């Protein structure tokens, strides 16, 4: 189920005049102070939809939205309640066209993951643009480390989608959790909840020990008919950022991506295809001791080089990344806390072959 992407004409709308110069003011600053410093940040997109998830000071997971303009991010945009200082991960399936007898609606399937107060995994789910419900993951009481970060992906499939979550256990190993969705479970939630469909959530691969509190990033992409590749990134006890690769058959060691990163570095990753038939390009974002966010890149995974992105962030800032584009045009979006309105989440964009600031701070700013 290949992710749909923006075209260059739609990309331009990400830079309206109001996004490039954002006025402050007491109301804006008060609203932004409700965003937790060092909040987990997660981002998903499809076609012209973008969603950003962060945590407020009361533990709520809030959703900010971009659909040609920014909205959301307020208290009434809370989709779940998490443990304080919870990591946040999100995954989205393709944009789908749903037709009812009375209307036609565009739906984006989204899953958002977080830690509950007892350090078990929680899930908020949406199969439309407005309706959220508690996902089935909450029933499994999967215990993870109190310092665990999270990553999540919808694995592309021509038959049915598969969900994967990556977390750190109490013994500091990195664990994969998975859910293979049956066709029946793709019905509207009101029907799916009454049907026992799919194989349920399961523990899958374990990648061994990692640095306690490491960031975790994951991405996935199609590599051919009914085949996909998943890549997972985390930090080892010697502070290297390493890669694990699943080639639709088994996991392998992808080697070292970053030789030395900030302990418990934030991590984000995204991928894109510059030219059909060429290897997939991958970008990984990580933190340094002096609180900069840097970029590593590879084309096909043969070697890693230093990317162009470099920007300072607040000491505990996390990072999220998405890509909109293909066929020679790619437009990466990064989300970090870089001090805008103190706690605001800022957007940085690779657009027309250079990095530039997108919106100074996403809603509630």
UniProtKB/Swiss-Prot annotation:
Superkingdom of source: Eukaryota
Annotated binding of beta-L-fucose 2, by residue: 111, 123, 201
UniProt keyword terms in alphabetical order: Glycoprotein, Lectin, Repeat, Secreted, Signal
InterPro entries hit by this protein: Fungal_lectin
Residues that hold beta-L-fucose 3 according to the record: 164, 176
Keyword check for Secreted: yes
Primary residence: secreted
Residues at which beta-L-fucose 5 binds: 283
Ranges for region 6 X approximate tandem repeats: 22-365
Carbohydrate attachment residues: 26, 76, 85, 118, 248
A Pfam family of this chain: Fungal_lectin
Compartments, as annotated in UniProt: Secreted
Binding site for beta-L-fucose 4: 231
Placement of Sequence repeats on the sequence: 22-79, 80-141, 142-206, 207-261, 262-309, 310-365
Signal peptide annotation: 1-21
Single annotated GO MF: carbohydrate binding
Biological role stated in the UniProt entry: Probable L-fucose-binding lectin.
Subunit structure: Homodimer.
Protein family membership: Belongs to the fungal fucose-specific lectin family.
The record's note on its domains: Adopts the six-bladed beta-propeller fold and contains six binding sites per monomer, each located between two adjacent blades. The six binding sites that are non-equivalent, and owing to minor differences in amino-acid composition they exhibit a marked difference in specific ligand recognition.
Name of this chain's protein: Fucose-specific lectin
Source organism of the structure: Arthroderma benhamiae (strain ATCC MYA-4681 / CBS 112371) (Trichophyton mentagrophytes)
């Amino acid at each position: 189920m290949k992710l749909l992407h923006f075209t260059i004409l739609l990309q331009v709308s990400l830079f309206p005049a109001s996004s490039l110069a954002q006025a402050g003011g007491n109301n804006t600053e008060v609203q932004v102070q409700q965003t937790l410093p060092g909040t987990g940040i997660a981002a998903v997109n499809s076609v012209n939809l973008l969603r950003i998830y962060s945590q407020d000071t009361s533990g709520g997971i809030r959703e900010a939205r971009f659909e040609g303009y920014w909205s959301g991010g307020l208290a009434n945009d809370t989709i779940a309640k998490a443990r304080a200082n919870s990591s946040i991960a999100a995954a989205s399936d393709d944009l789908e066209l749903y037709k009812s007898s009375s209307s036609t609606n565009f739906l984006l399937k989204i899953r958002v993951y977080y830690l509950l107060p007892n350090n078990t995994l929680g899930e908020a789910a949406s199969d439309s643009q407005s309706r959220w419900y508690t996902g089935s993951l909450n029933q499994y009481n999967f215990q993870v480390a109190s310092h665990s970060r999270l990553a999540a992906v919808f694995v592309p499939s021509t038959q049915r989608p598969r969900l994967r979550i990556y977390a750190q256990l109490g013994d500091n190993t990195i664990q994969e959790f998975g859910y293979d969705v049956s066709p029946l479970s793709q019905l509207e939630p009101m029907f799916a909840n009454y049907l026992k469909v799919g194989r349920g959530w399961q523990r899958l691969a374990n990648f061994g020990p990692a640095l306690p509190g490491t960031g975790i990033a994951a991405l996935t992409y199609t590599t051919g008919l009914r085949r996909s590749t998943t890549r997972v990134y985390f930090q080892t006890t010697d502070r290297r950022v390493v890669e694990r690769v699943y080639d639709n058959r088994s996991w392998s060691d992808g080697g070292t991506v970053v030789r030395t990163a900030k302990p418990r570095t934030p991590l984000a990753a995204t991928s894109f295809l510059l030219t059909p038939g060429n290897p997939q390009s991958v970008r990984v974002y990580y933190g340094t001791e002096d609180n900069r966010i840097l970029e590593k890149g590879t084309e096909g995974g043969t070697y890693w080089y230093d990317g162009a992105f470099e920007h300072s962030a607040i000491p505990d800032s996390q990072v999220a990344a998405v890509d909109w584009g293909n066929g020679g045009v790619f437009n990466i979006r990064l989300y970090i806390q870089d001090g805008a309105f103190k706690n605001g989440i800022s957007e940085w964009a690779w657009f027309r072959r250079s990095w530039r600031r997108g919106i100074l701070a996403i809603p509630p700013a």
